[in-house]
């Protein structure tokens, strides 16, 4: 979604944007079994606002953060295409789903089960399980579409900067 939105917004043309638009919307609400297409865990994501960590789907926090970013991209593209708010508002709402895996005491992204309970065995430097190619310290800053929202969530600029500085000294 982000590649298509970025290309269109930058003025790159030569493709059927309406077909791509429909494909982006479909991909945000489907997972073709046995393929890498669509969103694994989309049912949980759409219902709960995050991919739950107890439904047999790994990398659930990473998926939640990536899906939120892609929803922002879909929303942004929809606005550029002049799509009605009734069609794109759900993507604007889902773009904020990153907040649903934010643990306010830890100031990090942490997995939750389908009852809304944060992972009691959370390990901030674990590269497996709830994350992919990184750990909670890395992924907690993957809110590229709403940096001010993340800064506010972490308690303001001072707290955000302290957390960001910690990424460079935490082992793992």
Model features per residue range: what roles?
Residues 4-6, 13:
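Buried, small/hydrophobic-residue-enriched core segments of structured protein domains
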Residues 11-96, 100-172:
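Active-site core of glycosidic bond-cleaving carbohydrate-active enzymes
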């Amino acid at each position: 979604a982000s590649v298509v939105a970025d290309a269109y917004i930058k003025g790159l043309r030569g493709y059927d944007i309406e077909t791509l638009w429909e494909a982006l919307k479909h991909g945000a609400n489907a997972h073709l079994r046995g393929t890498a297409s669509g969103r694994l865990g989309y049912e949980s994501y759409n219902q709960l606002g995050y991919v739950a960590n107890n439904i047999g789907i790994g990398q659930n926090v990473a998926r939640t953060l990536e899906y939120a970013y892609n929803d922002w991209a879909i929303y942004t593209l929809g606005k550029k295409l002049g799509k009605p708010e009734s069609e794109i508002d759900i993507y604007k709402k889902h773009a904020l789903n990153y907040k649903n895996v934010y643990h306010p005491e830890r100031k990090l992204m942490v997995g939750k089960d389908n009852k809304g309970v944060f992972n009691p065995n959370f390990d901030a430097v674990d590269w497996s399980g709830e994350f992919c190619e990184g750990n909670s310290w890395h992924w907690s800053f993957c809110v590229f579409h709403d940096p001010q929202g993340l800064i506010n969530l972490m308690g303001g600029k001072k707290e955000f900067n302290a957390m960001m500085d910690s990424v460079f000294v935490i082992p793992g």
